[in-house]
Regions:
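Hydrophobic alpha-helical segments and helix pairs
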Residues: 35-77, 83
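Short, aromatic-rich membrane-interface segments at the entry and exit
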Residues: 8-13, 27-34, 50-54, 69-72, ...
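Generic multipass alpha-helical transmembrane bundles of integral membrane proteins
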Residues: 62, 71-181
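Membrane-interface capping segments at transmembrane-helix boundaries
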Residues: 202-216
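Structural signature of hydrophobic alpha-helical transmembrane segments
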Residues: 22-36, 128-137
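Hydrophobic transmembrane alpha-helices
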Residues: 1-16, 23
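C-terminal ends of transmembrane helices
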Residues: 2-3, 40-48, 145-152
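Small-residue-rich transmembrane alpha-helices that serve as helix-helix interface/gating elements
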Residues: 189-199
């Protein structure tokens, strides 16, 4: 309720604080590491795209529902390529939480002398996670393609932009999976892309209805 009356940057701050508190309940060591990463991402996000805070929050949430592909399609449809930056931050947050979850049991048994090795291990896992670069890269290409097609002076440009974004998303992940052997499940990715494209068409319909009503 509070976030409905505050800037999107406040939404991101509250979401990060909420995550840190939950992580701290499991392991204070992990909470400190998460807080450091969040501070860096938050400063980066505030510097370049503070108005798109909902993108950072939406990607981890939609990833749990297997439809994060909706975000780049919608951002190319209603925003501009600057949303590549907050979408990359959202991808980093999602995979960071996955890595922290994998190290939960290990960190609970650590003594004080093991803090530095623990942080080093988690940080290396985050750096070595090639899926972060792959997903961020594919999302960036999708945003650019959807935005470019949407801006064309032709009929049904928005509809074609959604279809183009969905096709680029599917082939982008297929190529990356064949080339880099990612952890992306192909069947789930294709199904999620189809659902995301359908949701984008629904959002486009309601956007046009609202625009038409406003004109009247």
């Amino acid at each position: 309720l509070l976030c409905a009356f505050t800037p999107s940057s406040i939404l991101v701050f509250l979401a990060m604080a909420f995550v840190i508190l939950h992580v701290a309940a499991v392991s204070p060591f992990m909470a400190l590491f998460a807080a450091l990463i969040f501070v860096v991402l938050y400063c980066f996000f505030l510097r370049f795209a503070p108005q798109y805070g909902y993108v950072v929050v939406a990607i981890p949430i939609l990833s749990t529902l297997h439809v994060p592909y909706l975000v780049p399609i919608l951002m190319g449809l209603v925003a501009n390529p600057i949303t590549i930056l907050p979408s990359a931050c959202g991808v980093i947050v999602y995979y960071m939480l996955q890595i922290l979850q994998e190290h939960t049991v290990v960190s609970d048994s650590f003594a004080l002398d093991d803090i530095l090795p623990f942080y080093t291990k988690v940080f290396e896992a985050l750096i070595d996670c090639k899926d972060i670069l792959i997903v961020s890269g594919v999302f960036a290409v999708v945003i650019i393609v959807v935005y470019t097609v949407r801006k064309l002076k032709m009929e049904y440009a928005a509809e074609l932009a959604i279809l183009a974004g969905a096709v680029v998303n599917v082939f982008g992940f297929l190529i990356c999976d064949l080339r880099f052997d990612t952890r992306v499940t192909i069947g789930s990715m294709i199904g999620g892309t189809l659902l995301s494209a359908l949701a984008a068409f629904v959002a486009l319909f309601f956007k046009r209805v609202l625009d038409y009503t406003a004109v009247e």
